[in-house]
Regions:
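Catalytic cores of carbohydrate-active enzymes across secretory and cytosolic contexts
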Residues: 1-256
Length: 256
């Protein structure tokens, strides 16, 4: 959701995108908090004292909690490291990778911004589970676990995962893998992507991943895509997380 000014009125619009189309119906049914970057021109006007707003406007069902990013973080983390480094690398279009060391610094800073908001939500509503999404927040699971090791953290990776021969060209390959492996469950779109991630963990971190864990997602966080069906957003899985912990926080790296 994005808030805009139209003829002196504050207007809330549901944004397009696969993640919104998948998650919004689930959150309408079960409630929770969606933490997302606030990039709408009037998003700051719409929030309360906790930087949150109830959505959808016509029938509020869950909270949308905003994270405010600086212009440097948007350029360096979102447009830079996420979209010019990780996205083309994961799609193995290496000629499109535009790496700058400063991008990584901003990427770390953006993940810390989201961490601050997650920790505030966990203070306000202890015992919630956290579900993070996509390549913009690969460091966040590890950051959360260092502060709240008992918090259930799950991840769904919405793009391909390359094999170790490609992924190892990243200078920050270890940090990214360690951040993701801190999660309790890690889901991919296909079984082959899960296998590729497992190979990277073995090759780069020398991690021990058994075939059972790699296939079933137990307890090491490598799961088949079927466990987190992207098209249906796995309402059942999301419900299980809520039932286990008494609440949930759904984190989208940014997208409203």
């Amino acid at each position: 959701y994005a808030h805009q000014r139209f003829k002196n009125r504050l207007v809330c619009q549901r944004t397009d995108g696969g993640l919104t189309a998948a998650l919004d119906p689930s959150l309408r049914r079960i409630g929770g908090t969606w933490i997302a970057w606030g990039s709408g021109e009037a998003d700051r006007e719409a929030v309360d004292s906790t930087d949150a707003v109830a959505v959808p406007p016509e029938c509020p069902a869950y909270r949308l909690r905003r994270v405010w990013l600086s212009s440097d973080e948007v350029r360096g983390a979102y447009r830079g490291y996420a979209n010019q480094v990780l996205w083309p690398l994961c799609h193995i279009t290496l000629d499109r990778v535009a790496y700058r060391k400063s991008y990584w610094q901003h990427y770390v800073a953006m993940n810390r911004r989201f961490l601050e908001t997650v920790l505030d939500e966990l203070r306000r509503r202890p015992g919630q589970a956290v579900w993070t999404h996509d390549f913009h927040l690969a460091l966040l699971p590890g950051m959360i676990k260092r502060v709240h090791p008992a918090t259930v953290v799950s991840v769904f990776w919405h793009v391909p995962w390359p094999g170790p021969e490609v992924f190892r060209i990243l200078p920050e390959r270890r940090e990214l893998l360690e951040g993701l492996l801190a999660a309790d469950t890690l889901g991919f779109q296909t079984v082959s992507y899960a296998h590729a991630f497992a190979e990277c963990a073995r090759d780069i971190l020398e991690a021990a991943i058994s075939p059972v864990h790699e296939q079933a997602g137990l307890p090491l966080p490598v799961a088949q895509g079927e466990l987190f069906a992207a098209s249906g957003v796995c309402a059942a899985c999301h419900m299980n997380m809520v039932d286990d912990s008494g609440g949930d926080v759904s984190i989208d790296s940014a997208w409203r």
